[in-house]
């Protein structure tokens, strides 16, 4: 059961990273709209680069979360089968 608890704890940490990055991306999208309306081309290009990197990181974290979910399920099933 300790392993299961550890996995769940790690998954919660990943979820926190995921939510943080999503909120940062949303914040950048708001700034993107402002810069676009102000016709700030150079700053807008730099922001879009940063957003592209954030999206890559977000996909990596989402994949990690999916893998952790599968591992948590396997661990739970192992614990459950051992108690039957």
Predicted stretch roles:
Residues 23-52:
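Short E/K-rich amphipathic alpha-helical oligomerization segments
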Residues 6, 10-13, 20, 39, ...:
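Non-transmembrane, amphipathic alpha-helical segments
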Residues 33, 46, 63-64, 78-79:
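Short, charged/polar low-complexity linear motifs in solvent-exposed/disordered segments
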Residues 54-73:
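Amphipathic alpha-helical coiled-coil segments
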Residues 68-84:
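Long amphipathic alpha-helical coiled-coil segments
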Residues 1-34:
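N-terminal acidic leader/helix
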Residues 12, 61-64, 84:
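Low-complexity, flexible helical/coil segments
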């Amino acid at each position: 059961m300790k392993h299961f608890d550890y996995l769940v704890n790690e998954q919660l940490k990943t979820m926190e990273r995921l939510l943080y990055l999503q909120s940062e991306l949303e914040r950048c999208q708001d700034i993107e709209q402002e810069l676009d309306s102000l016709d700030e081309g150079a700053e807008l290009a730099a922001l879009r680069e940063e957003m592209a990197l954030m999206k890559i990181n977000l996909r990596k974290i989402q994949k990690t979360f999916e893998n952790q979910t599968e591992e948590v399920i396997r661990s739970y099933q192992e614990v459950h089968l051992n108690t039957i």
